[in-house]
Amino acid sequence: FPKTDYDVDIYADNYIGIYDNLDNSVVDYEYLDESNYPFYHVDSDTDVLSPYFNLNEKKPNIVIILVEGLGRAFTNKGAYLGNWTPFLDSLSTQSLYWKNFLSQGGRTFAVLPSILGSLPFAQSGYLGMGEKMPNQLSLLNLLKHNGYETSFYYGGDASFDNMELYLRRNKIDDLIDKDKFSTNSGLLPETNGFTWGYDDEALYAKYLNTRPSDSMAKPQLGVLLTVSSHNPFKINQQQEFYDRFEERMTQLDFTESKKQDYRAYRDQYASILYTDAMLKKFFENYEKRPDFSNTIFLITGDHRMPEIPMATVIDRYHVPLILYSPMLKRTSEMASISSHSDVPPSILRLLKSNYQLDLPEDTSWLGKGLDTVVNFRNIHQIPLIQTKVNMKDYVVGTYHLNGDRLYEILEDMGERPVNDPKQQKSIMDAYNGFKQKNAIITNGGKIIPDSVYIKYTN
């Protein structure tokens, strides 16, 4: 097993220590031409992930698993609804684990542009722009430019919410959705004649059976989006996971009264237990492949499942991020806040530091990169979009603006209302600045110069 962060050499140049008075001041960008390219800025070369890795000579495979509805409220130790993911909880102790992580959307439509492209929302989500999506750089096209083979696997219909269009525009090599599954085995049960598609077990099997594992293959970037834990939460092994639901409540020492309350959401919790069990099976099978030892896995939720009542506004976006790899030389649990948009810059900086990737010096990333400080803080400005017609949330430091209400985010990611007109005005000004930039994109503005796009996508 990798070492924990307590084994770290605190005198290493790139070690970020634990301090009593952490700085929550927000880091800003040096923009280059805001009127023409509102998000285009000088990129940072700060690589915070390399100190955790012993990487191999060959570029690593990257596997990103986006789990439908996986909220922190019921995931891992400390979850306020109880820990319903025993496998993920175990995996997180062998990983880099961000427990105070945020998705940037309240629904699935926001996840691909955020975690692959670190993009703004435009009017109703970046994907909502359809054919008018401006050219941009992403993990997909930048890694393809650097010799990677890219793929997307989804048990449902990838044309939903223009996901397929976005992926094609990012030059995806292989796109596998429900039309590419050759059997009905694994189809989720129909509800009123409708099924979302194939369950997690079938999705993971499809990935393992169709991705190359030999050492001569190109390095892989694989993105998987699950659907089993989506409303209406009907799964194929329904009774088995109803039984596991009852067993789990007993393991969690629930009183009979509390059990009765939770039974109102039996389908939801059963689907979470199923999701966790299928992830366990996926890793057990992947471990048998020769490429397992050279793979970096990222697991996160696309958003928090809203069908189980939420405790706060921020709860809708509170998801885990687990970064696991056999190449990790130490583990860490981070209480600092980061978001989906921080993933692309950090992954690319890790690879650039170790494999001299050909990447632009200037970028349009919304996120600054993952924060690896273990104590609670937030150095990011994080816009959030709950639905395609509801963009009113903005996080700056440990404050969360929700419309005309201001909340302080607490160390357990709870929040409390605060009355601080000066702070509220400051955050509102920052949010208005983001919305002005975002409106330029909505109205046909560009993300990056054409010359940069052409150089790094050919």
For each feature predicted by the language model, list its residue ranges.
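Substrate-binding rim/cap in mid-to-C-terminal beta-strand-loop elements of soluble/periplasmic
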Residues: 109-119, 311-355
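Phosphate/adenylate-binding glycine loop and adjacent helical scaffold
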Residues: 359-458
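Metal-dependent active-site segment of extracytoplasmic phospho-/sulfohydrolases and closely related
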Residues: 270-314, 347-351
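Catalytic-site neighborhoods of secreted/periplasmic enzymes
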Residues: 112-195, 231-240, 246-248
